[in-house]
Amino acid sequence: MKYQTLSGLLALSLLFGCSSSPDVVPDVPPSQLYSEAQTALQSGTWLTAIEKLEALDSRYPFGAYSEQVQLDLIYAYYKNDDLALGLATIERFTRLNPTHEKMDWVLYMRGLTHMAQDRNFMHDLFNIDRRDRDPEPVKAAFADFKKLLQRYPNSPYAEDAQRRMFALKNRLAEYDLATADFYLRREAWIAAINRTQELQKTYPDTEAARKSLEIQLEAYQQLGLTDAIERTKQLMQLNPL
């Protein structure tokens, strides 16, 4: 909840305080401004597209292009890595248009945007392992894609959402594994066992669940729990890495 509150405040401050000013965009008819925004979107000049779309949104909030402008902003913000602005626009659109025909796409984009929050360019560039970083954006993305599948099972975005959920599940399982390993290294044996048990229950079909048996075994050995040791060894034989 703290994560959602802070991110929401940040998004609102960005949306109303830091977005590009419509004053820099010439005062032209909305049809011309919309056409220029579409040209910028098609050419991938995201910042230009955003400036023109924001100007349209500000000057003509109830105009003929208002809904499509918001949808285009959602996409442009995502492509430009303006993720907080993207999420704020998604929430606004969802609140104003809960039954819109493109709500499946909006849910899909919310999932993609939350996934993008989990990315870190420097970590990807230098291949730094950050399995222990905050998983809240991943949980949010998983929930978005799950909601998409539940509400719109025949959506053209459903298949890709399902594939992404599989990857997100592995990411969450790796986080729990890293947490269990942290407890093990701190000699917090019970905490390590509890975390591995939770991992195995929640994500039983992941590699992280199989790896967690090694942590569980060591913790049981440190506690001298003979029956639990034997049971874990049997599970390791049945679930080899």
Curated annotation (Swiss-Prot):
SUPFAM superfamilies: TPR-like. A lipid is attached at C18 (S-diacylglycerol cysteine). It comes from the Bacteria. Coiled coil: none annotated. It is found in: Cell outer membrane. GO terms for biological process: Gram-negative-bacterium-type cell outer membrane assembly; protein insertion into membrane. The keyword Ribonucleoprotein does not apply. A lipid is attached at C18 (N-palmitoyl cysteine). Part of the outer membrane protein assembly complex, which is involved in assembly and insertion of beta-barrel proteins into the outer membrane. Belongs to the BamD family. HAMAP family: OM_assembly_BamD. This is Outer membrane protein assembly factor BamD. It comes from Vibrio cholerae serotype O1 (strain ATCC 39315 / El Tor Inaba N16961). The lineage of its organism: Bacteria, Pseudomonadati, Pseudomonadota, Gammaproteobacteria, Vibrionales.
